[in-house]
Amino acid sequence: MLEVRGIDIAYGAFAVLHKVDIAVGERRIVGLFGHNGAGKSSLLKGIYGMLPVRAGQVTFAGEETTNDRPFQQAARGMRLVPQEGNVFPNLTVEDNLRLGALRLAGEAAVHAARFEDVYGTFPILRERRRARASVLSGGERQMLAISIALMTRPKLLLLDEPSAGLAPILVQRLFEMIRGIRENFGVAVLLVEQNVNEALRIVDEVCVLEEGRIVFSGAATDKDQIVRQLWRLDRRTHCSSGEKP
C-alpha cells in the first residue's frame, strides 16, 4: 500500500528527517510514536506532498508519488487529517461532509450511501448534522474531520494526533472508532499519536522516531521492546533538560 524508503526532509537548511523507512500494508494500522519535535508530523506532510522530500522515495498503491502534490495524493486515495484546521467551522456538519464528497464521482444515490456509511460509524454526527462545526466538542470535531476524509473513499488515512486535547473516555471511544473504520471501510491507517497506551490497543505495527530517525520498527505485540525504546527516549529527554529521570 504505502512504501517510504530512505527519505530526507528539511525545513530550509534544517534537516528534520534522515533516511526514514516505513511501510503500511492494506487494511493495517501503523502507529508512529516519538516525542514532540521528533519529525512525526513532518513525515506525514512529506508523504502527502506538503513538504519537499530531498532524497528517497514514496510509493503508494504501486505508483511512485514522491513530491506529488496533495490533490494528486487525494485523487489516488490518500487523505491526511491534520491535528488542526481540519474542518470548516462556519459550515454545518452536513455541509462539511458534502464538501468532502465533491471528489466522489457517481449518482446522488452513491453520495447518500456514503453519508449513511459515515453516520453509521459516527452516530453523533447524524444527530448534530444541522449544527455548525464551530459548536462541536473536541471529540465530535475530530470525528467530523475523519468523516470528511472518509467521504472520498480513501485507501489510506494519515491521522495526525487525533486524540490531542480529548478527555480519556473520548480517547478510548475515538480509537475504537478508528479500528471500526479499518474493518468497515477497508482502509489502512498511519497514526501519529502521543497517547501510546491507548494507541497500542488498535495498531498492528509500530515505528518510533527519535530526532528524525527510525529507532524501532516492529509488531505492536512486542510491547516490552516498544516500552523500552520509549522509556529510553523519556530518560534521554529528562537528562538533556537537566531533570532527574
Outline where the language-model segments fall.
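Conserved structural motif at the start of ABC-family nucleotide-binding domains
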Residues: 2-4, 17
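The feature captures the beta-strand-to-loop junction immediately N-terminal to the Walker
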Residues: 33-35
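A short, proline-enriched helix->beta-strand linker immediately N-terminal to the Walker B motif
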Residues: 151-155
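Helix-to-loop junction immediately C-terminal to a conserved catalytic motif
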Residues: 48
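C-terminal boundary and immediately downstream tail of ABC-type ATPase nucleotide-binding domains
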Residues: 120, 204-245
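Conserved ABC ATPase signature
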Residues: 132-136
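Helical segment within the ABC ATPase nucleotide-binding domain
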Residues: 172-185
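Conserved ABC transporter NBD signature motif
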Residues: 56-65, 76, 110-115, 216-218
